[in-house]
Structures are given as C-alpha cells and as structure tokens.
C-alpha cells in the first residue's frame, strides 16, 4: 500500500513540475502574426537578408517588461524574480507568432530541465524545416503550440541531447 502511494505522489510531483515548463493554455494559447502564412514564408520568415524577420518584429523592451510582471502574477508563480524567467513567445516570431499579443507571451522558467534554452533550440530547428519545405508553417505552429516538449522529443530527442 505504501509503495503504491509513493508511486502516485511521484507521478503528481512530476506532472506539477512539467506543468511549469509548459504555458497555461488558458493564459497563453498562442497568437499568430497575420502577415505570415504558409503561402508567403519565403517572403517573410524565410527571407534572407541582413536582418531576420524576428529582429525586425521584436516588440519594444518596455512592452516586454510590463508584460513580464503581469504574466508572472497571472501565472501565480511563487518565485516572482524576473531574472528566473524569459519572456517567451509561445509561437516564436520566427514561425509567425504574434510579437505583441499577450496571448502569445509567457514567463518561461530558465532553471528547469525543459528550459527556455531548449525551446529556443527547437525553434531554430523548426524554422529551418519550414524554410526547407520539410514541414508546413501551420504544422510547426501547431506542434509548438500544443506541446513544445513533445515537439522537441520528436525532432531532437531526449532533453540531454542538447544543452
């Protein structure tokens, strides 16, 4: 009996930890930039040039700072130290995510097995696949929006495969 209870407690703790690595779908369902579509990726997010699409569409720092404080409170994180989070676009700008819609921004933990660094790496892989025509923009957006950790495991493998 005691062994079974221990098992379920460990499962519950694991699920709680995992939940903080993924955005709350009610607070951050993701939002798209209407300028970017499957039909124009070569002219938008995949266009070669001095500046990337992401660099040209970053929201102002003041917007991110304001949103960061609001989102940490909305998420109810017990650790309110903003240095422990990265304001992350659930659907990255490099995949046509909205730069300024709060529904696309969440405070992603930096200190975690599934840290912001890992999601950033996945974003680069998905962007490359979209630009090479290996997957559609819509597929990449859906996969990262529904569960970016599952997408990471699908395209990269276990968390220890990349720092």
PLM regions and their residue ranges:
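Nuclease and nuclease-like effector domains acting on nucleic acids or nucleotide cofactors
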Residues: 2-5, 9-85, 94-163
